[in-house]
Amino acid sequence: MFQTINEISIHPELYNQKKVLIQGWITNIRGNLKIIFVELNDGSSFKNLQCVLKKEFIDFDKIENLALGVAVEISGIFSNTPERQQFGEVLVETLEIKGNNYNTNFPIQNQEISLEVLRQMPHFRHRSRLFRVIMKLRSALFFEIHKFFRRQGFINFSAPILTSNDGEGAGEVFIVDDENKDFFNKKTTLGVTGQLHAEAYALGFKKVYTFAPTFRAERSNTRRHAAEFWMIEPEVAFFTLEQIIELAVKLLQKVIKSVIIRNKDEFIFLEKAGDKNLRKRLLQFCDSQVTQISYEKAIELLLEHQEKFEEKDLFFGCDLKTEHERFLTEEIFHMPVVIINYPKNLKAFYMHQNEDGQTVAAFDLLVPGIGELIGGSQREVRYEKLLARMSELNMNIEEFQWYLDLRKYGNPGSSGFGLGFERLLMYITGIENIRDVIPFPRTSKNILM
């Protein structure tokens, strides 16, 4: 029976002086004519296991092809070594090469490789230590989010990927068709949001959420934007703006704390590699009340520091840039902040129109280092108000009649939000570029393999 490095590293004392059998890949190799030290990784942990090969046990002539990246199967006696930095090592009794290299130029060498270089080989970069940590935390975060919603009584809803509706109204969509250009007999795109369809399912299930790929044909070449990313979108019938904000904050605080508690070693690694205060900063947010201000107040605060911005044209109705969002979180509040009641011209057509006639019941949750992490709103449930807004924006009413019809039959109103999964992972890990927290990034002018 095979053991994993993760199992052994968690309780090395249980395996002390016992025989272990492990399959994995060589990440480091050094030695001389009498003894060879091999570091092995099997993917179960970002940690490597040191394996000691001695000439009296192993025929070195049969393992002359050992090199970085080679796949092997080893058996031997494990020794727990708490007095050293490593958790233990294996004195190898047998070693079998399971996958040789065809040449000596294995892409992930034992030297510092820049993130820019690693982006050019997304099919290999997860075999570096940093990306093992990132991808393990990505997986852990994925499951913590599903666990949170299950405990809160939500139904997981699979929104369609192909759709005839642009839920955001920005027109930044990828058009899908077959070679004959008439497969659906109407314009069909990859979904930019699952929200509209989730609203339909919230009327019946009350609490639903989607967690799925999302596609935006944004040509923004920034470190925060990707053409394909994952989005978490809960929708709750009967909820007001304040209730959905409370849910958003609770979600973040719960999943962040859980990921930190369950992945201590990964965070220690990240702190050594980058932000020394990563966990302290995240846990401070998890244990704090989040400040909430109006969009109007945000503009007032930013105007007091107008000279510090590249974009100095600040007024009621302007779209806040990333530099403004980050300034609010990093220089004024020093932690995440929620902004509510945006001008309606800045937001999507479906948002509840406030009594002032100028703003909508929308919110953005901003975090340091990134800016907007979550965007959400209370939905407009009044049929005539929604229809008037859609007409004002020259939308195709016929295409959205099904969405309008949701207002006709027992609709108490609903609220929801969208949370970018990769942006959340950036915030949690301190990684600064969205291309480095997704396995195979797709951005403008870039689609490797």
From Swiss-Prot:
Domain of life of the organism encoding this protein: Bacteria
One of the GO BP terms on file: asparaginyl-tRNA aminoacylation
GO molecular function: asparagine-tRNA ligase activity; ATP binding; nucleic acid binding
InterPro entries for this protein: Aa-tRNA-synt_II, aa-tRNA-synth_II, aa-tRNA-synth_II/BPL/LPL, Asn-tRNA-ligase, Asp/Asn-tRNA-synth_IIb, NA-bd_OB-fold, NA-bd_OB_tRNA
Keyword Nucleotide-binding: yes
Catalyzed reactions per annotation: tRNA(Asn) + L-asparagine + ATP = L-asparaginyl-tRNA(Asn) + AMP + diphosphate + H(+)
Assembly mode: Homodimer.
Protein's name according to its UniProt entry: Asparagine--tRNA ligase
Gene that encodes the chain: asnS
